[in-house]
Structure formats: C-alpha cells, structure tokens
Amino acid sequence: MVVYDLLVSLSKESIDVLRFIETNLAAFNQQYIFFNIQRKNSIMTPLLITPQQEKISQIVEFLMDEYNKSNRRPGPPREQPMQAYPLLSYQQSSEEQPMMPYQQPPGDDDQPYEQIYHKKHASQQVNTELSDYYQHILALGDEDKGMDSMLKLPERAKRESDDEDDMFPIKKLTT
C-alpha cells in the first residue's frame, strides 16, 4: 500500500514536471525558430520582444554556443553568413499605372453569367446523355428478345485436333 501511494505521488509529480518541460520546450522551440527566421531573412528592423522572450533568447544563445563549442569538428572554418542589407522600398514610376482589381459588372446575380450558363448547359447535357443511354439499353433489351428465338449456335466444325482426340479415347467411368 505504501509503495502504491509512493508511485501515485511520483506519477503526479512526474506529470507536473513533464507539463513544465513541455511548455518550456514549446517556448524554447518558438523562440529558436523566431531567431532563425530573423537571421535567415536578414531582418534589420527591431522586433518587439517581451522580457520573458529576451531571457529565453539569452538562454537559447548560451545553450547553442555551448553546444557548438563542445561539438565543433576539426576542419576548415565555416563560411560566415552574408551581412544583412536593409530592404529598399519599391518606388513606383509615374509612367506605371497601378493595377486595379477585377470588378464584376453590376448585376443581381452573385455568379457571373458564364458560370451559370455552363452549369445549366452541363446539367442538360448530362441529362440528355443519360436518357440516350437508357433508351439504348431498352432498345438492346428489345432486340435480345427477338434475337433469342432466331439465335442458334453454329454446328461445331471438325478440326484437325479432333482426330488427335480420337486417338486417346476417354473412358467413361460407371459406378
């Protein structure tokens, strides 16, 4: 019984510890991704960082530096990342005309005329194809009724292989 209580208390504590680690790992990963994106995109503008994020970023940088120091492999030094350059804003010349978004002509319908027309046309086409198909099937059924009375299997023509079959007669088993 004592062991059971001990296990229950340990499991509760371990769940709390795991939850704490999980929340901190999520914050750690978010901050790490945030800084990697900032470095890769060479963003020069200052970003709003809360004090908690700043502490996490300091911890992340310290851990990454320690990891890099302990796992450095001998060899030529790595290339330094390119220096960041601020992005220049796009200047539109006076000759260029600004692109206007497409505006639908005023009307009562929510859908353009072509879409409505194509939908109706397609449904009519499918209906006519289906009715033609069913008419064809019914016609085939009528033909089959007439054909059954006239249809007779042709007599089996004698082949060269029939002679070979006669050479090895099959005996019928009688019981």
Curated annotation (Swiss-Prot):
Localisation per UniProt entry: Virion
Main localization of the protein described in the UniProt heading: virion
TM helices/strands, residue ranges: none
Residue ranges, compositional bias (Low complexity): 95-106
Record key words, sorted: Late protein, Virion
Region (Disordered): 68-111, 154-175
Coiled coil: none
The family this protein is said to belong to: Belongs to the asfivirus H171R family.
Name of protein: Uncharacterized protein H171R
Taxonomic source organism: African swine fever virus (isolate Pig/Kenya/KEN-50/1950)
